Amino acid sequence: MKAVTYDTDSELAYIYVLPPKKNRNVRTEELRVNDCLLLDISQDGKIAGFECFGEAAHLCAPFAGKSRLYVKDSDGYHFRVCQHASVRSCYTVYRVTFCFSDGDYQEFAGFDLDGTMYHSAFLQRLTEK
């Protein structure tokens, strides 16, 4: 299972936070501060995954098909589109912190998953060793 998919025709990226399951997603909503990120919310109130449009999708495209996506520490799992991405603003929803490299929440830099809510064997398999 790969954590990121990218459709070259539509130029959309999808990042799985939870393993895909049939009928898991109850609703979809835009990230309030950035309409280029569309969140799929599971029935238990977690982000199951999210779709990226525009520049965010292009930044995530190189990760499509990769078997290692996350870095883990005592706070949880972390993903950055660039290894040394500077973070100037953050927005947290459903215990996922979306990080941006500008103050206007437009330049997607990655996200952090709360380790107490988003801990699973799925994420562990996708974590750099």
Curated annotation (Swiss-Prot):
<dbReference type="Pfam" id="PF10049">
    <property type="entry name" value="DUF2283"/>
</dbReference>
<protein>
    <recommendedName>
        <fullName>Uncharacterized protein YuzE</fullName>
    </recommendedName>
</protein>
<dbReference type="InterPro" id="IPR016789">
    <property type="entry name" value="UCP021389"/>
</dbReference>
<dbReference type="InterPro" id="IPR019270">
    <property type="entry name" value="DUF2283"/>
</dbReference>
